[in-house]
Amino acid sequence: DLVRQLRALQPEIAFVALHGPGGEDGTAQELLEILGIPYTGSGVLACQRCMDKVLAKHLFVEAGIPTPEFFAFSQLAFRELGAADALGEIEERLGFPIVIKPSSQGSALGIKFAGSPEDVPGALVSAFAYDTKVLIERHVAGRDLAVGIIERDGEPHVLPIVEAIPLDEPFFDFEARYEIGRTRFVCPADLGNKVAERCAQVALAAYRLLGCRDFARVDLLLAPEGEPTVLEINAIPGLTDTSLLPQAAAAAGIGFDELVATILDNAHQRQDSARR
């Protein structure tokens, strides 16, 4: 099993590139800490905060970081309240359209757009299939932006911003994210200096608030009036050829090998500091 393999290998550094529950929710990180193995990326608490969208949203609100209006239901609370009352609460608090998401999933899994009350039951079924808690969020019409952040010598730096333009859907869902031809990506996004600086400012504030380190991706929606709102933070963003963080790094002149080396260097520096 994994523990036996890790104990046998005793790696100098574990490069964490896992996704979903068990990988980016702090579980793997906690295991590595128990085994005394240094690792890349955010620590246990930051991963837990990022993975739990509802918790992250509450933290954003408390810190004054702009984020779309929302509330959440656990599966138990939804059953106790009843479908009719739950729908009434949604309509009264948020109106329509809304976006319904599992609280703790990545890659846009289980996310559904609900343009009217009739869309809500199916969207809730989809979200509850992935988690026992769902986030219900006011839909913000605007541009989907991904702000990659990478640290060098302990300081986070914002990479060129990526804009995701879905070609046939109202928002950037799982299919639009992963099916070739469903989304066009533009990097750097055509934002203008003032808006780009504001997006970077908001993304860095969210990154620091949740305690991220080494690298992350902050997903924003840019409203028509030019104000960015934070949707979520991915503590372990994808590192494939088509992933957004490597695209952003490439636009900054950072090749994939250099990107990986930089992430590893951060972990090495932490290890060296801990030994002193």
Indicate where each model-derived feature is located.
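ATP-dependent carboxylate activation and anion-phosphoryl transfer catalytic cores
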Residues: D190-R276
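Hydrophobic beta-strand scaffold residues
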Residues: P38-Y39, T67, I98, F256
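A glycine- and small-aliphatic-rich helix-loop capping segment at beta-alpha/alpha-beta transitions
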Residues: E30-Y39, S116-P121, A252-G253
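Phosphate-binding site of ATP-dependent enzymes
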Residues: K112-Q201, L222-T229
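Active-site nucleotide/adenylate-binding loops and adjacent lid/helix of ATP-dependent enzymes
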Residues: L6-A8, R49-R143
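ATP-binding N-terminal substructure of ATP-dependent carboxylate-amine bond-forming enzymes
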Residues: D1-L45, R49-M51, L55, S74-G88, ...
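Short alpha-helical
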Residues: G23, D144, T240
